[in-house]
Amino acid sequence: PVKIERQVLFWFDPIKDKDKFHYSNMPNTGWDLDNGMEFYTQPNIENKGFKVAMHHNGKFISENDLNRESNADDLSIVKNFLEEYIPSANGKLIDSRVCVYTNTPDLDFIIDFYPNDENLIICSPCSGHGFKFTPAIGEICSELVINNGTNYDLSEFSIKRLMKQ
């Protein structure tokens, strides 16, 4: 019961205080707005621009319907966010990319042995937040492969929770 969600990422050239957006001066940030929208930002790394994107925008698609180009609606949502919350970042658009999240219903990972086959391990989908957990997930998966188990409690990530739905 996974769903594919289209995500659009944007990089901007801030209109002022550009040094404040450099990775040495700014952390990654997450924004949970009162209207339910979520955004995240990342500082300028390697002079690629200040990155801004919505997190879980709810545009579910099929794998055959993925439009890899950003559009005016995508850009407008992010520009409006910048105008209200980080106006000095709301400069020239440098680049945009489209990627996908593969979401479970509860937006959590699957890290488990395949039912009825202890020789197969399912690791993911990560529902849009797996990358930052890569070292821990890698450690856990290597323990599952080598030791056929881990000391970490993986009950929250069991595939069985999704099979009940």
State what each model feature region is.
Residues P1-N119:
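Active-site substrate-recognition segment that forms the wall
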Residues N80-Q165:
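C-terminal catalytic lobe of FAD-dependent flavoproteins
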